[in-house]
């Protein structure tokens, strides 16, 4: 009994649509079978279940990302896989992936690093570019022909879009702060110190 992608009890707010990982290639040698426990969102569960089936079919040659991509394509169609991948990142937290969303964390860290160096416009650009990608991916997914899936994940898509809007507002605030700081410095250069003053 493998408790993935189930999202009951304290996990009700999570959407487990990430890759099926963390299972040994030798598991089949010591087990007669494997039962994956799905979410209440049956259609969304097919993404993880399909990847899990690929693992069980050939554990030794299993590639988690390849299996996820193939399974996702069956659920949303190949044209929407990239959009689902970006959305998947924001929903990454699960028992298999307890860390913060990797792609989103990388984007935020990159923007913060540039802010620390005083490159505020560059930081805002990095942040806003990804936030607009998030919004575009949500819009594309909402038009997907798999209406049952979209109905199931609608609450997460709505929250995802709201966070993207917040990110865009933050990027605009950073740009405004940069313009203000430039107006205060004779050289026209923005410094991290001037932003903290």
Which stretches of residues belong to each language-model region?
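C-terminal functional modules
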Residues: 60-197
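Catalytic-core regions of glycoside hydrolase
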Residues: 1-65
């Amino acid at each position: 009994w493998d408790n993935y992608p189930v999202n009951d009890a304290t996990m009700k707010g999570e959407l487990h649509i990430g890759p099926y990982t963390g299972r040994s290639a030798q598991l089949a040698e010591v087990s007669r079978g494997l039962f994956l426990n799905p979410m209440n969102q049956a259609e969304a569960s097919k993404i993880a279940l399909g990847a899990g089936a690929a693992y069980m079919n050939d554990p030794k040659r299993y590639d988690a990302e390849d299996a996820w991509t193939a399974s996702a394509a069956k659920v949303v169609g190949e044209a929407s896989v990239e959009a689902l991948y970006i959305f998947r990142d924001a929903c990454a937290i699960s028992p298999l992936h307890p860390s913060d969303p990797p792609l989103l964390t990388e984007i935020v860290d990159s923007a913060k690093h540039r802010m620390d160096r005083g490159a505020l416009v560059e930081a805002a650009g990095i942040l806003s570019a990804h936030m607009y990608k998030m919004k575009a991916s949500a819009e594309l997914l909402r038009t997907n022909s798999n209406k049952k899936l979209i109905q199931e994940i609608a609450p997460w898509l709505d929250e995802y879009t709201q966070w993207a809007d917040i990110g865009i507002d933050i990027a605009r605030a950073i740009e405004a702060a940069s313009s203000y700081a430039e107006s205060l410095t004779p050289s026209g250069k923005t410094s991290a110190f001037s932003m903290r003053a």
